[in-house]
């Protein structure tokens, strides 16, 4: 499944700055950054649950915001990209 994650973490304190780094790192573990606080991920159900669990452990629900959008399948049919395309095609072969 393709998901889109957006977040807004309060960085007024050092603890908030640390939470922001943790949230970004968890998102990087599962997908790719498309904007400063926006990630696209291609995950299965088990990975999705793990991702959600890890993110919820990072945030402070009293001061932070986290949104996870599940994209309609087939996602490529509904995603339109314009301009510089720096995203990775998760379904394409990986050549090293």
Swiss-Prot record:
Belongs to the CRISPR-associated endoribonuclease Cas2 protein family. HAMAP family: Cas2 (MF_01471). Its EC number is 3.1.-.-. It is an enzyme of class 3 (hydrolase). The keyword Hydrolase applies. Homodimer, forms a heterotetramer with a Cas1 homodimer. CDD domains: Cas2_I_II_III. InterPro entries: CRISPR_associated_Cas2 (IPR021127), Virulence_VapD/CRISPR_Cas2 (IPR019199). The keyword Metal-binding applies. The gene is cas2-1. This is CRISPR-associated endoribonuclease Cas2 1. Mg(2+) binds at residue 8. Disulfide bonds: none annotated.
């Amino acid at each position: 499944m393709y998901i889109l994650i957006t977040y807004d973490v309060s960085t007024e304190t050092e603890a908030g700055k640390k939470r922001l780094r943790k949230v970004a790192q968890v998102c990087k573990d599962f997908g790719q950054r498309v904007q400063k606080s926006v990630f696209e991920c291609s995950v299965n159900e088990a990975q999705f649950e793990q991702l959600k669990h890890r993110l919820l452990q990072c945030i402070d629900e009293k001061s932070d915001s986290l949104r996870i959008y599940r994209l309609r399948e087939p996602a490529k049919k509904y995603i339109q990209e314009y301009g510089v395309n720096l995203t990775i095609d998760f379904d394409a072969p990986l050549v090293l």
